[in-house]
């Protein structure tokens, strides 16, 4: 069995043009099939790190590889297929007249034949339990349904890594549960950026805490969330009365 990780970040450092240093030698490895939560306060460098994973940001020190393929100019088309990012607001990536056309957009843009596009659309919508919505306008769906369709737009590209930005935000309890059920069933590597610590515990056995542009903790989610001093140092808070050791 291959030991090549889905995602490898090695000594990644990055400064913006204004001189702000956002990352200081970040190391991160996600093995195939892992679901990992990326935790940290605002301004920790989480977004900067995520934007390196598919080559939107580059130019600093270190390297990023996706399933062994370096994130470099010559590989960007394939890298962006392999790393699918689902934004916090699903309306940022749903812009076609129907759900089916939104999910088909990526495969069509990659020049896949129409029978393959149709198969991928059907498979991706089935994976997020939205198979009956292909002909519906996205704006007729609930927020939670639109978020699941946004996931489907990425799944149709058969990614190696699925990156989720605050996936539980603005969801009601039923929407949280439905999305969790979808994510737990997906056969892809997942990196979940979130402030929702109970959701991280529900979905991810492992968590990485980033603060000040460095990884300050990496380990079992339950153990990290039970460390009150760690949470306090890095401005992470559990809901009142929530005990991660009892869930």
Across the structure, where does each feature detected by a protein language model lie?
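Catalytic Walker B motif of ABC-type/P-loop ATPase nucleotide-binding domains
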Residues: 162-165
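Conserved ABC transporter NBD signature motif
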Residues: 62-70, 79
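The feature captures the beta-strand-to-loop junction immediately N-terminal to the Walker
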Residues: 39-41
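Conserved ABC ATPase "signature" region
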Residues: 115-133
